[in-house]
Amino acid sequence: MAMAIDGYECTVCGDCKPVCPTGSIVLQGGIYVIDADSCNECADLGEPRCLGVCPVDFCIQPLDD
């Protein structure tokens, strides 16, 4: 599973990008997106790091298949 950023909720603060251990978060077309192929939800860290730093509730959520 991977995480996803809601483009409508994201404030483009950039807090998530530097904490992503897989480098899956990139700025694309003026919004941050998470590469689902490389995101592993920080499996070995207990919880996704992006969730811990995002100032907006429900901006980053598990990607629906």
From Swiss-Prot:
GO terms for molecular function: 4 iron, 4 sulfur cluster binding; metal ion binding. Pfam families: Fer4_7. InterPro entries: 4Fe4S_Fe-S-bd (IPR017896), 4Fe4S_Fe_S_CS (IPR017900). Binds 2 [4Fe-4S] clusters. The keyword Nucleus does not apply. One of its GO terms (biological process) is nitrogen fixation. Its cofactor is [4Fe-4S] cluster. [4Fe-4S] cluster 2 binds at C20, C39, C42, C50. [4Fe-4S] cluster 1 binds at C10, C13, C16, C54. The keyword Mitochondrion does not apply. This is Ferredoxin-like protein in vnf region.
